[in-house]
Amino acid sequence: MVSRLSKRYRSRVQFSISVMDENIYLSLSQINKDIRKENKSVRNRLQSILLDNKFLQDRVIPIFPHYPLIPNERCGLWYCNPSSFKQTSYFKSTDGHVNQWDFSTRRLNFHLLETIRDNKGIIIVDSTRRGKKIPDALSKTVPIWCAVLNTLMLQETEKNVAIDKVLYLPPETVPKSEYDMIKRKIPELVAKLQKLNIIDSKKLNELFMGKLLRPIWVHPGSSLLDHSVDYFTGEVQEYEAWETPEDQNIIPIILCTVSYQAQDGMDKRYGFTYVQGAADDHELWSFGLDSNMFWAHIEYLGDASYSDDQLHDYIMDLAAAKLRNQCYIQDKGSLDEVFGNIDKITNEISLGKVSSGLTINKNLKQKLKSEYGKVIIFSNSVTVAEDTDDEEESGTDPFISIYKLQSGDKKSSKALRSTFPRIHGEIQSLFTNRDEKIKPMLICCNTGTDMSIGVILSILCTKYTEEWMLTSELPDISKLIVRKHLTKLISHLKGRNVNPSRATLNSVNSFLM
């Protein structure tokens, strides 16, 4: 009897526990669902970005008032009003990941060198998602970049450069074991840069007067940003601008992380749910809003009283207005307005950026014909308006060639390699009969930094010397030659962050070699 009762009791207890476990699971599942919903909330994201911007404006800039802001693309752009900066950087966190430490020859960021010299320092702005205090781009990628340049510069006067003297990493973020591994990697990365033959020890010494690039990290909670309090009155004292110590032969590179560490869905102190690194992967939550649109309409989008639905409707209206404006520009605007500030690469090649959804009408086509002998566009949404009166377009070699390939898409980048023979066949006439005055070609993609760059690289490697002089002989081509042309292209396009994807460069190499 007792045995039967104990069995019945145990079965009831087990049933109760299983029901309780299921309820706990359902509760946790609902909590996770709510957190994901709050993380995707446009209102929470935009308010979090503004809170982080307030940290930048109130705590960082007063300490370093003389250094220009350099938002690190893409995330950093959201935290800086476009009126507050003139340049951006592109340091990727992947170049700082464990066992992937690198000095990228695709992302040299050499357009910053003169800015660093002229202002005796810069502030690079970025953010990071939950779990980290500093993104890898700021804790390792930029410091490695600085260490490589420091080492190369010191080789002008020192035979054996002590890497400890030039490599600085945040000890609270990067363990000593990883520091040692990165230190051993630096000579290899210096040699990699030297092979490109684009900058040497002498030039770096002239630029920085022998001063080392010294990363300095700031983030919410940094002791460097602590304000002083009057001991008697309790009043917060005004911030004093930081000065480079006279005994330090350095140029400060301020690496600013604007977001603070917070567990998802937990911080609701400010009337919204704070999202750490809110601007990251904006395509997943912004409904087409970009950083420029955000700051241009900050009065409405920054108003915390509006709901997600109201913000969504407003963003949809902005997108519609942007499309109407594009239609007006393509009809009435200049070619620079339509194709994003066209850059001249050589006398024969120009680079542009084409807007998604553009329809090239007869008026725009005539403008293009007045300036160019050939237009090549990579986009899956750009079209040419049908024009039955234009008999010139009925030939086999049309003036405008549109390839339905999209920058930023790996499949498109891979498909590029099979497209190269056709492209080079189309442009051949522009490089023959050079005695005749032939108009240059315009090459565009939807970013102006990826597929169009790949095509231009293939042309530079096959039609030009390393000094970009036209040649009728096919130059010797190797991966090093491709990198040299890319490096020169990056230096030439100071106002544009050139960043062809690995897949695009693989297609270029496959075609050329």
Swiss-Prot record:
InterPro entries: Rit1 (IPR007306), Rit1_DUSP-like (IPR033421), Rit1_N (IPR033449)
EC primary class: transferase
Entry's EC annotation: 2.4.2.-
Cited function: tRNA backbone modifying enzyme that mediates initiator/ elongator tRNA discrimination. This enzyme modifies exclusively the initiator tRNA in position 64 using 5'-phosphoribosyl-1'-pyrophosphate as the modification donor. Recognize the stem-loop IV region that is unique in eukaryotic cytoplasmic initiator tRNAs.
Protein's GO biological process: charged-tRNA amino acid modification
This protein's GO CC annotations: cytoplasm
Alphabetical list of Pfam families matching this protein: Init_tRNA_PT, Rit1_C
GO function term, MF aspect, one: pentosyltransferase activity
Protein name per the record: tRNA A64-2'-O-ribosylphosphate transferase
Miscellaneous remark of the record: Present with 259 molecules/cell in log phase SD medium.
Keywords: Glycosyltransferase, Transferase, tRNA processing
